[in-house]
């Protein structure tokens, strides 16, 4: 990919943002080297790795990179067999700790989805617990070795501590006895030796070795003779300590050298993971998605946003190219937002082809291009003192030398900077030449000739950026299929140009041109209306789909409950019959035994008695089954009242009646949290046990206290608010509340209207009104329940 397009479309700014999420210097360098990949396979693989990292971020949070430093220099030194510094070893130890933690972090549990690429990288990580443990045991910080690094070091430092304690006692005694000769009653250290500050004129009074003097020469730092031997002993111990530390560092460095190949592989994988998660973190904050990548030259971006414009200011657009048409001409006035659309498309393509998530909705598509060319801005004319036209044409010549059917070409104000007639003719010729090669092209222009060219040329489409004449600002919404209107007359009028001047200007323009501009304006208005209608239709379609799915789930739950009830009944009936059959078999066996014994009068009596038992058992089983059927069927309701409790045998559950029977003989009932319509004739009298009656009385006393007199629906969308209010009204009705308040806020009125529409159809609502002064005004609705 050519460097000019990366610079012109400000891809470097995107890389700077991504770099801020990387931790190691090496990963930051990888980000700065990032550019579109050379094959569609590489593009898809790098997009997939970013998407996998985003999935893990969403599910597990940030990976455990804490304490990670770039260890490239330490590894290079270790590879040569050099002794590493305390800092270098500590950083390698931390890197090995991160290796272990990352391996655990990326391990997939059975219930988790597979992440092919990142799990493959995890398999390359080799945990070196022994090396990590040896370093962490020996090194405390970047400039300190632990006492426990070796027994010898521990012994040396203990001796040093004792010697230092002894010499401090000795030097304090000397300071006290020679106080009159000293500048300060303190001791200090020079060159690792304890000394005292003696006034220069009294140096003969304190025998010893002079180690230093003050800048004025008034003070000499003398090591008293009495301290020389102790200082020598401390110095010897310090030399031993330094030698032992060097031995420990050499030993640890040798351990690192022994495992250097594994350490190097681990570090390279960690750097790559750092790079991948930096891309994912940026994509997450951007609200980015993984695009679908094709090789057919098709671009289809839904709700595309320029990634460098702040979220609170950016306007999204649907941008598509490559199916019905291969060239898109964005027309309209200057400062109309055309260039932003051009840059948005080009920059999103560069991001996607570089493995970054794009600022667009799910299922957006980008195409793999071998080259993207852009002629935007006057960069070259400023650098080389060329005219605007010469600058653009120089760049266009270079583009036309290289562009082919795998190229995407972006032109800003093609043909501008020269005579309009010649400029338009050149622009059309350039477009035709590139179209013949199979290029995909997006170009902005304000030439009317190019609008006509797009209208009459196959595979070329007009587009415009919506412009608000009232505010004299573009809305940045792209309208594909509608050429742009210059709005020069209207803008001039808004800025204060006299009407008579504008009317004179209109006379200069041909009637056909004016009619063409009016036609464009009419097309724009119709396009905007159609787009708004389509957006509203999509919202309604989504709402309908949600309701459909919700009631489908309810129906499936009811069916499941009913099937379970039937299954329970069948099991119980089978148990009764099986029990009766077992007893009957036992009686029949007794009868056969009696018959084999011979038929005596006594035997006949016993036989008849057993036959009687059999008849009784069968009759008893039949009676129990019949009773079970009657219990399940229940007593029919003679009168149905709203609010009464009834039994619904099909689900073997008590329900609350919510409405009177309609013309189909159906009533609405509530079963738990579900509302369903059933035939009134299917309802039965609900019989209560004594315990249920006691519980119901207690609930009746508590219900009124449990249901609040108002509910706050602010902050919810219309669907959620209506669902919540519906459930609240049911609870309030059952609790016996006569009046409740729904708080929806004032806002735009959308939520209030949705609530109002719901209340008109609600079976429990007698009437409703907006709140009065002191009740919340138009921000609340007061509901009277039946």
UniProtKB/Swiss-Prot annotation:
Transmembrane segments: none
Signal peptide feature range: none
Annotated ATP binding sites: 332-339
EC nos: 3.1.-.-, 3.6.4.-
Enzyme class of the recorded protein, top EC level: hydrolase
Residues of the Smr domain: 711-786
Database matches in InterPro entries: DNA_mismatch_repair_MutS_C, DNA_mismatch_repair_MutS_core, DNA_mismatch_repair_MutS_sf, MSSS, MutS, MutS2, P-loop_NTPase, Smr_dom
GO molecular function, one term: ATP-dependent DNA damage sensor activity
Keywords tagged on the record: ATP-binding, DNA-binding, Endonuclease, Hydrolase, Nuclease, Nucleotide-binding, RNA-binding, rRNA-binding
Pfam name, any one: MutS_V
The keyword Methyltransferase is annotated on this UniProt entry: no
GO biological process: mismatch repair; negative regulation of DNA recombination; rescue of stalled ribosome
Summary of subunit composition and partner proteins: Homodimer. Binds to stalled ribosomes, contacting rRNA.
Family: Belongs to the DNA mismatch repair MutS family. MutS2 subfamily.
HAMAP family associated with the record: MutS2
Function: Endonuclease that is involved in the suppression of homologous recombination and thus may have a key role in the control of bacterial genetic diversity. Acts as a ribosome collision sensor, splitting the ribosome into its 2 subunits. Detects stalled/collided 70S ribosomes which it binds and splits by an ATP-hydrolysis driven conformational change. Acts upstream of the ribosome quality control system (RQC), a ribosome-associated complex that mediates the extraction of incompletely synthesized nascent chains from stalled ribosomes and their subsequent degradation. Probably generates substrates for RQC.
Protein's name in the database: Endonuclease MutS2
Organism: Clostridium perfringens (strain ATCC 13124 / DSM 756 / JCM 1290 / NCIMB 6125 / NCTC 8237 / Type A)
Name of the coding gene: mutS2
